[in-house]
């Protein structure tokens, strides 16, 4: 399961929010909650149920978000957010550009390594949320870039 999907399963039961997503899987999970309004972005869907194309990007450019939550294959202080395929670069940059606050969700295994293609520098994130196993050295590098680092406790 994706990090975003796991986040949807752990939202407080009484939260009242509107969510914009490019993922049919996440939209399907969220639509089960009466207190969550879902806007599903359109466009050509990939085999994982996500839309990253020009239609989705143009829709994103017409919206404004208080917060965006994103993840990618990897993140490092030097190479930034990175992925294996370049199709999503413009989409994720449009999401960040349309957001007041960009929050990265990165478990330990995605931190401090680089994938093939950089989406953007790490300091485009305002906040990085990770788990208790993340390397202090890696986290200090993000802190030095001015990124607020939040460590989720082990439970």
Regions found by a protein language model. Give the residues of each.
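Conserved phosphate- and dinucleotide-binding cores of soluble alpha/beta proteins
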Residues: 18, 24-155
């Amino acid at each position: 399961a994706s990090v975003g999907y796991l986040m949807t399963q752990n939202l407080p039961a009484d939260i009242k929010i509107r969510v914009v997503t490019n993922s049919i899987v996440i939209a399907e999970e969220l639509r089960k909650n009466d207190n969550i309004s879902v806007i599903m972005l359109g466009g050509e869907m990939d085999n994982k149920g996500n839309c990253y194309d020009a239609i989705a990007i143009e829709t994103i450019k017409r919206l404004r978000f208080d917060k965006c939550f994103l993840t990618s294959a990897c993140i490092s202080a030097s190479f930034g957010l990175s992925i294996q395929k370049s199709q999503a670069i413009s989409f994720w940059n449009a999401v960040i550009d349309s957001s007041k606050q960009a929050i990265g969700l990165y478990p330990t295994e995605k931190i401090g390594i680089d994938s093939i293609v950089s989406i953007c520098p790490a300091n485009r994130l305002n906040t990085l949320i990770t788990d208790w196993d993340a390397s202090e050295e890696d986290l200090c590098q993000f802190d030095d870039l001015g990124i607020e680092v939040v460590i989720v406790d082990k439970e």
